[in-house]
From Swiss-Prot:
Keywords: DNA-binding, Repressor, Transcription, Transcription regulation. This is Probable HTH-type transcriptional regulator TtgR. PROSITE patterns: HTH_TETR_1 (PS01081), HTH_TETR_2 (PS50977). Residues 33-52 bind DNA. It holds the Pfam family TetR_N. It comes from the Bacteria. Probable regulatory protein for the ttgABC efflux pump operon. May function as a repressor. Residues 10-70 form the HTH tetR-type domain. Gene3D superfamilies: Tetracycline Repressor, domain 2. InterPro entries: DNA-bd_HTH_TetR-type_CS, Homeodomain-like_sf, HTH-type_TetR-like_transc_reg, HTH_TetR, Tet_transcr_reg_TetR-rel_C_sf, Tscrpt_reg_MAATS_C.
């Protein structure tokens, strides 16, 4: 009985997340209410509050779902024991771009995060949440780049802090550009070129040296 109740709770949580995704995609995060999400999910607002305190936690759940399939590669590139951290980063970026183009749900969630998540005054918690996510991502990229430097895959004089900012900006900007103008960039056909462009920047740019 306990197991069944737990499974039902997990199913309800998944329903709520799916409904939030649909509502955010249609209306934007700021214009969507928890009542809108409850109606789409076929649950009460009380059921939503059982799983999530506010919209910020729902946005975080969507963001977490994006990271699930990439987590093992991210952890590998950040590990000091990994022999090929730059190779793991390359595989990770290829996976990120391929999923963006080929998986409709991944595309919708990225669309929400990039173009439908307004940082208005009443959305300050979501702004803080996104700031924290960017800083966490920066920390992970910095660790991966430092590992690649130690393994001789990147220049010893690479400024890993500055390089991490540049790499995040490159990837995030390319995703945002493709979402806005998908026909202007062959992200799938040229995916290896786009990834290697970013990695070449790390290897070759004098401006990223100490």
């Amino acid at each position: 009985m306990v197991r069944r109740t737990k499974e039902e709770a997990q199913e309800t949580r998944a329903q709520i997340i799916e409904a939030a995704e649909r509502a955010f995609y249609k209306r934007g995060v700021a214009r969507t209410t928890l009542a809108d999400i409850a109606e789409l999910a076929g649950v009460t607002r009380g059921a939503i509050y059982w799983h999530f305190n506010n919209k910020a936690e729902l946005v975080q759940a969507l963001l977490d779902s994006l990271h699930e399939t990439h987590d093992h590669l991210a952890r590998a590139s950040e590990s000091e024991d990994e022999l090929d951290p730059l190779g793991c980063m390359r595989k990770l970026l290829l996976q990120v771009f391929n999923e963006l183009v080929l998986d409709a749900r991944t595309r919708r969630i990225n669309e929400i995060l990039h173009h439908k998540c307004e940082f208005t005054d009443d959305m300050c918690e979501i702004r803080q949440q996104r700031q924290s996510a960017v800083l966490d991502c920066h920390k992970g990229i910095t660790l991966a780049l430092a590992n690649a430097v130690r393994r001789g895959q990147l220049p010893g004089e690479l400024d890993v802090e500055r390089a991490a900012v540049a790499m995040f900006a490159y990837v995030d900007g390319l995703i945002g550009r493709w979402l806005l103008l998908p026909d202007s960039v062959d992200l799938l056909g040229d995916v290896e070129k786009w990834v290697d462009t970013g990695l070449d920047m790390l290897r070759l740019s004098p401006a990223l040296r100490k």
